[in-house]
């Protein structure tokens, strides 16, 4: 009988330590970085939550910058199904999708599409594109919004960052944040 009581006390102490103690410690540590702990949410100018800066969203209107293609989920951009397609780069499906995307962007031999705009990222939900890929789209976005292309290019530069600091050459832009900055103008 004594061993049962000791066992029950041990179970209760373990549950208390693991369920309450561990959870409280993790929650407390997360509060040191509250933005990240809450999913790195981005709010629009009107105060509504527009999305997360960590997950790509689908933008299809010409007035917005378009992210990399996504293979996550049936129609892409499904955060619950984040993954690449696992198809070979030599796959006929991948080649056909790349041709369709290049046509959508109006790519030509004189103006080839940056590869990242035709290929999904490994996780399928990469929220960033390179400044080069953003500049490729600047003309379309400016024309659709009725503003000067130089204004759009200046905003791209303003929104750009180097993810590795001085260790990286390529600058990136977050597509959601860039589109929200355009809407705020």
List where the protein language model places each region.
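Hydrophobic membrane-insertion alpha-helices, especially the h-region
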Residues: 9-28
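A broad, structural surface signal
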Residues: 2, 6, 13-14, 180
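Extracytoplasmic/periplasmic C-terminal soluble domains
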Residues: 140-185
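Flexible, solvent-exposed loop/hinge segments and secondary-structure transition points
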Residues: 2, 6, 19, 30-137, ...
């Amino acid at each position: 009988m004594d061993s049962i009581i000791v066992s029950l006390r041990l179970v209760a102490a373990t549950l208390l330590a693991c369920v309450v103690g561990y959870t409280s410690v993790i929650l407390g540590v997360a509060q040191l970085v509250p933005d990240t702990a809450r999913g790195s949410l981005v709010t629009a100018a009107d105060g509504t939550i527009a999305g997360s800066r960590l997950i790509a969203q689908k933008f299809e209107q010409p007035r917005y910058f378009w992210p990399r293609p996504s293979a996550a989920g049936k129609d892409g951009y499904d955060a619950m199904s984040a993954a690449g397609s696992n198809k070979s780069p030599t796959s006929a499906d991948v080649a056909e999708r790349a041709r369709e995307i290049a046509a959508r962007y109006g790519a030509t031999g004189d103006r080839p599409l940056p590869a990242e705009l035709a290929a999904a990222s490994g996780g399928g939900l990469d929220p960033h594109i390179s400044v080069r890929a953003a500049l490729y789209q600047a003309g379309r976005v400016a024309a659709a919004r009725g503003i000067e292309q130089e204004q759009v290019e200046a905003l791209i530069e303003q929104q750009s960052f180097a993810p590795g600091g001085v260790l990286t050459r390529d600058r990136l832009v977050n597509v959601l944040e860039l589109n929200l900055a355009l809407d705020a103008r």
